[in-house]
Amino acid sequence: MSDVRVTVQRGQQAEERVVRTGTTAAELFDGERSVIAARVGGLQRDLSHPLAAGDVVEPITVDSPDGRAIVRHSCAHVVAQAVQDLFPKARLGIGPPIQDGFYYDFDVERPFTPEDLKAVEKRAQEIIKAGQRFARRVVSEDEARAELADEPYKIELIGLKSSAGDDAEAGVEVGEGELTIYDNLDPKSGELCWKDLCRGPHVPTTRHIPAFAVQRSAAAYWRGSERNPQLQRIYGTAWESRDALKAYQHRLAEAEKRDHRRLGAELDLFSFPTEIGPGLAVFHPKGGAIRTVMEDYSRRRHIEAGYEFVNTPHITKSDLYEISGHLDWFADGMYPPMQLDGGADYYLKPMNCPMHILIFRSRGRSYRELPLRLFEFGTVYRYEKSGVVHGLTRVRGLTQDDAHLFCAREQLPTELDTVLKFVLGLLRDYGLEDFYLELSTRPPGKAIGSDKEWEEATELLREAASKQDLELVMDEGGGAFYGPKISVQARDAIGRTWQLSTIQVDFQLPQRFDMTYQAADGTRQRPFMIHRALFGTIERFFAILLEHYAGALPPWLAPVQVVGIPITDEHVPYLTDVAAKLRQRGIRVEVDSSDDRMQKKIRTAQKQKVPFMLLAGDEDVAKGAVSFRFRDGTQRNGVPVDEAVAEILDAVERRIQV
């Protein structure tokens, strides 16, 4: 056997190694227990992958993002094997890793019960303990069809691969290039225990799955279409250690306490009446108060930053979205057309941008007007499948704080930098502080425009992002059909990441709508367009803030900022006068004049997460004072009314948390 040279890459450090021909990645990293797979030539591979001369090999450790995804994918196989051991008639769907976990879909005779899930977890634990070996086999299409003849969904995926090539569902299982099956083999006898169509890679053995849990089950349509059979989906999670699993479960429990859907009901903020339909929220008075404050503050900041407010209708003729390309690229996300005016198709608008373009085009424009920044709280409608809608974070009727900026080419770098700074500053005003940026590039096969235009737009966004002193993460292929985008990712109080603002450079729509302005030299030039949604949507940002603060919004955002609590009914008029003073200064205040005892009134206000409580009894009335009680239970007695009012106003004006 001859020797070959390979390079081991660890971050910025590279080490050249001489190894025997046929050496595997496992042998290269022998003794490094945390290494569960490798990246060879930029592609993820099993540790059993043989190395060739010139290969650049990077270890993938179990505690890295890629490592966790591989562990979770392998655990999905183990859970699927457990299901088929317990329910032999179960047919397999797909089982990909997802954020913080994995799922696997099954066609079974009945939904899984909690007892079933316990049994599945127990059997999966036995499989992991057995140390079954993951072994990759390359097969032909005919061989795959023969081996998986009893798995109709796998057969369908094989067909999708051969006919479509890049089908998303097929890609989860079969990927690109050759077809592969992974066998789970008995570590002693080598006997086949189970197999699945899969592109891999996987951990070497089931013992390389350090910690996992089966979480829940739910119904899911095959390939996400309501026209297809309904399957049963088992969700699970897997981590690099038991401690990491416990920490995740703690975060999950904390997230459940903060669930905006539960808080929305408890705090009487919003609801989703079945009479209206899934994904369509109704905001109650208290929720409406929060939205009003959010929008009013945003409106004020936008005016200060040179934005001009516009309003556009909720429906439009199809012509508009034919020109924009939405009907070609976004039709699945739109509601069906309404036929009006003698057969013309009208659509509920899914996006505001084409209408803002029409405002720009409504008259001749000069370079002196640029940059032109148009802004709207525009409600749009998107047909999200009923199984996908989720509280306020995924809805069908949504209000975007939507801006479209039109500028000259030479203004783009400055405008992008200004927009990003404005976005981050405004998000910080709402109490979010921990950010990173994500740059999404051209989506393969789903984009309009030339390579040069995309490269130029992407580079402009990259330059703007680099000036913000924040981490920049690449999202290859994640851009919109008309241009690349930067998204602001924010981490909340319990460390979860939320995508918030998006900023997109668009070369395409100005061309499609033949937009022009008169340049300084008298020629007609094409403006450049920036799409920008700061909150993303009002509804989603509302939910994020509610969960970030666990319902205890800072005083300036709280729907009720102050509650007056009289010790007896005799003190109601006094507190009513105090409330009037606060109300005159714009404070949202209530007086609890119910028949409840004082202690219950305090508990009620605390449950409603009211920032300030003003208590009054005989002594307070005599002194013109109140007892000033805070949300955390601390209390100052004998505070003069004017001092209490001033302190409340100060907290609201400075937007501080209490």
From Swiss-Prot:
Zn(2+) binds at residues 353, 404, 531. It catalyses: tRNA(Thr) + L-threonine + ATP = L-threonyl-tRNA(Thr) + AMP + diphosphate + H(+). One of its GO terms (cellular component) is cytoplasm. It is found in: Cytoplasm. GO terms for molecular function: ATP binding; metal ion binding; threonine-tRNA ligase activity; tRNA binding. Keywords: Aminoacyl-tRNA synthetase, ATP-binding, Cytoplasm, Ligase, Metal-binding, Nucleotide-binding, Protein biosynthesis, RNA-binding, tRNA-binding, Zinc. Gene3D superfamilies: 3.30.54.20, Anticodon-binding domain, Bira Bifunctional Protein, Domain 2, Threonyl-trna Synthetase, Chain A, domain 2. It is an enzyme of class 6 (ligase). Binds 1 zinc ion per subunit. Residues 1-61 form the TGS domain. PROSITE patterns: AA_TRNA_LIGASE_II, TGS. The keyword DNA damage does not apply. Homodimer. Belongs to the class-II aminoacyl-tRNA synthetase family. This is Threonine--tRNA ligase. It comes from Parafrankia sp. (strain EAN1pec). The gene is thrS.
